[in-house]
Regions:
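Hydrophobic anchor at the start of a short beta-strand
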Residues: 1-2, 61, 94, 146
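ATP-dependent small-molecule kinase phosphotransfer cores
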Residues: 2-84
């Protein structure tokens, strides 16, 4: 069975993160980094639909965002080493699909969406892209099969490429 999930999750901590992202409640960058790590802990280990439970059942787990996203996003304001230490205990996936897209194009796509979250600013996204590069370099040779995909291609083409790489 294929189990598709995301971070932040729909759990209590994930919902709190979403409220912070939408600027409904204030939080320091360090608090946000800790909340992502806490949400990830629940996501991985809590309950019958946790990532580890699904993996133990033999399911294929696909998650939209994981510790690599934390390293890219939270490192902008907290520093890479701080965020890495928070996320170091988490297991690495077999595969990572990184959708590489120019921040200017991403910003253009976001402009049609209306309300943006606190990270969806062009200047911030350019810094995030630099930390994604650092993160990918850091995990090269770690055993994670890293797939860098052109994020400017249509979603259908990206889906086709990802499914081909998963060898379902």
């Amino acid at each position: 069975e294929v189990f598709v999930t995301c971070e932040p999750t729909d759990g209590e901590i994930g919902r709190l993160i979403r409220r912070i992202l939408h600027k409904e409640i204030p939080a320091t960058p360090q608090t946000v980094a800790h909340l992502y790590a806490a949400d990830r802990t629940e996501h991985l280990y809590q309950g019958p639909d946790s990532v580890t439970a699904r993996l133990e059942a033999g399911d294929l787990v696909i998650t939209d965002r994981y510790l690599f996203s934390s390293l890219a996003y939270q490192s902008v304001e907290c520093g890479f080493d701080f965020v890495y230490r928070l996320n170091e205990p988490f297991p690495l996936p077999r595969q990572l699909f990184y959708l590489d897209i120019d921040p200017d194009l991403s910003d253009k796509r976001l402009s049609g969406r209306g309300v943006r979250d606190m990270y969806e600013r062009l200047s911030f996204q350019k810094q995030v892209q630099a930390f994604y590069e650092r993160t990918l370099e850091h995990f090269a040779g770690s055993g994670v099969e890293i797939h860098r995909l052109d994020g400017s291609v249509p979603a259908e083409e990206l889906t086709r490429r990802i499914l081909a790489s998963l060898r379902l």
